[in-house]
Amino acid sequence: YKKNIIIEKPICLKTSQVTELYKLAKKNKVKVFPVFQNRYNKAIQFLKKKKTIDALGKLRIISVQVRWCRPQRYYDLADWRGTFSHDGGALTNQGIHHLDAMRYLCGELKTVNAKMSTLGAKIEVEDSVVANFELKNGALGTLEVTTSARPKDYNATISLVGSKGLAQIGGLALNELQIYSPNQNLCKMNSEKIPTAYGFGHFSFYRDIKKYFSNSTKFPVSFDDCLKTINLLNSFYISDEIKNSVNPTKIKDSKRLGT
């Protein structure tokens, strides 16, 4: 159809698919707009500022937690749900927001060691993953994502421990700055009350698209940026597949995702 396209999370399941997508877009002279709406949240944008993040000192520990509920009836709503070919598991479908936000705030990872399991539903994909990782800057991290929590969604947080302080983002959609030890008074003004898990990020997302077409303002998510998030996603699956640590920059695509 040769139309500009907006693609919700995740833009693709494989890095090879991302590359092919952007090649086709370039060939047909159209634009791809991947959606990472939580990047626009006040709390995320606050911690993205150099002055704000520097006040925490050198990053030492990063923790990502998602404890949500997706019962069997959720997967039974459509045949594609809970499949590796069209959906991916808890990390791909739910945890992708937090994985991307962590990478957006903290930078690239050096190693990933992940273990996945299906604990709360009869599906072929994982509904739970735990992992440890190391950033290129030497900081250590843990990731815990599950949709096997019952009977409801509980917490979803990202915390950053630095040499001078601690910051934590949480809420329904990473919309609350819960802790900022350098100045706790800044938390309320950098938090948002949201009616649903979708938050308000899509409004800012569409404004950026409008700016792109109105005055050629550069869209904030580039091909390379998007590719790195999908590459990181695949590294967790590959680590689970080979039962060993992997370097995200030296791996290809998961054998399960998108196949």
Task: Report the location of each language-model feature.
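NAD(P)-dinucleotide binding in Rossmann-like oxidoreductases
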Residues: 119-126, 136-204, 222
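Predominantly a Rossmann-like dinucleotide-binding segment in NAD(P)-dependent oxidoreductases
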Residues: 38-122, 243
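A general structural signal for well-ordered alpha-helical segments in protein cores
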Residues: 18, 43-44, 98-99, 202-207, ...
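C-terminal helix-rich "cap/oligomerization" subdomain common to oxidoreductases
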Residues: 17-19, 53, 136, 210-259
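Beta-strand-loop-alpha-helix segment that lines the small-molecule cofactor/substrate pocket
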Residues: 1-39
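Short glycine/proline- and charge-enriched loop/turn segments
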Residues: 2, 77-85, 184-191
